């Protein structure tokens, strides 16, 4: 009887630990507007509860490119090339998830209906870093991101993006239109000044 109980207990604990591990590998964003912070700064957090992301801090140097240069998009999750897009003439310096103009972008994944996952060229991670290299403000980043998926297609599942500059903080949600349909469905909302917000793997 004790052996059976021990085996059942072990199986139960393993099941619970696997469920907890699955739940823990998630992302959380906290958003603070300038009117809600003590010193008038905007700031956002990006907690990715996954050991595979510990210690990663990318540096992308500002650069100038000749007209006609192409940029290869690499899927952030798998490392697989997805295709090429036209490079802009000048890109900004990016450290981690913030660029030289204090524009910062983070995300949490909410997934959504699987039939809406697209087959485009740009995944959610690449969308973040390309926008940081090409934008000076949150509003410009939203324009860049939505223009890119409209032209080249959106590869990922549903995402909530946090986009902040020294003046404004925004949340933008995006999901694909499905197989064979280029572009994405998206909505962007500015967090009112003097307010805070948060999202963690759930669509609004």
Name these PLM-found stretches:
Residues 1-11:
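Bacterial N-terminal signal peptides that target proteins for export
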Residues 37, 132-138, 156:
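Cysteine-dependent hydrolase recognition
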Residues 20-26:
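Sec/Tat signal peptide C-region and signal peptidase I cleavage site
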Residues 11-19:
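Bacterial N-terminal signal peptides
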Residues 27-124, 144-204:
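A contiguous strand-loop segment
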